[in-house]
């Protein structure tokens, strides 16, 4: 997969990107949710920069928290914050901007870029609101206020694994809907794929209804 040369707030998905499967083995105030935000599409330099910023604050201990703005993600973020504060670690909160209609080669590069740019702009606003809301509900958790925000364009599981490889966190914390039965076995969730494919410890948090 080719890599972009610079981190930009508007970048398109790398062509030929496919989701892996288990078989393949594939300083903010309480009112400021934008402690630090980087938006990249797999750029090593930008990911390394985000990792260094987080590690500088936590002496190398970082917890990566992928979120999709669901109640399950919020529960995972709160759990991760509690854990981070108990061990003097910091958080990198990751959101992967995914275009559901993305098909390699289907659109021209220009059309794809415009479409993903629009989705990325909307995602940034939702990301900001998600973090602002989480901060407002959990004012006692400094880890949430000081979290590094990282927004990456691509396919969720692929990008989560790539970011984990670059950032090298001590662990990942993710939310899950907790499906059971045949639907659970045949479909599988993104959280389950990350658990199976990521070499790092992954904790799954379920939202209490």
Would you name each region that the model predicts?
Residues 1-58, 132-172, 209:
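Structural beta-alpha unit
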Residues 3-11, 22-23, 32, 53-113:
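Small/aliphatic-rich secondary-structure junction motif
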Residues 85, 165-166, 196:
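Solvent-exposed polar/charged
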Residues 108-112, 166, 190-191:
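Short, hinge-like loop/turn segments at secondary-structure boundaries
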Residues 111-126:
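A short acidic, glycine-rich active-site loop
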Residues 171-196:
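Glycine-rich, Arg-bearing micro-motifs that act as flexible, cationic patches
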Residues 200-209:
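Short, flexible loop segments at boundaries between secondary-structure elements
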């Amino acid at each position: 997969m080719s890599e972009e040369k610079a981190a930009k707030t508007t970048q398109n998905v790398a062509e030929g990107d496919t989701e892996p499967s288990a078989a393949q083995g594939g300083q903010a105030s309480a009112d400021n949710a934008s402690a630090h935000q980087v938006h990249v599409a797999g750029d090593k330099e930008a990911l390394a920069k985000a990792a260094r910023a987080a590690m500088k604050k936590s002496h190398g201990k970082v917890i990566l928290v992928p979120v999709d703005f669901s109640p399950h993600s919020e529960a995972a973020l709160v759990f991760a914050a509690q854990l981070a504060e108990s061990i003097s670690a910091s958080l990198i909160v990751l959101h992967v901007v995914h275009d559901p209609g993305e098909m390699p080669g289907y659109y021209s590069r220009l059309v794809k870029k415009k479409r993903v740019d629009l989705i990325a702009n909307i995602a940034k606003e939702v990301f900001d609101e998600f973090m602002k809301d989480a901060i407002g509900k959990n004012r006692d958790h400094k880890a949430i206020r000081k979290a590094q925000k990282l927004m990456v364009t691509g396919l969720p599981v692929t990008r989560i694994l790539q970011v984990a490889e670059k950032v090298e966190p001590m662990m990942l914390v993710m939310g899950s809907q907790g499906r059971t039965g045949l639907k659970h076995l045949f479909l599988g969730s993104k959280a389950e794929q990350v658990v199976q494919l990521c070499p790092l410890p992954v904790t799954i948090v379920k939202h209490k209804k």
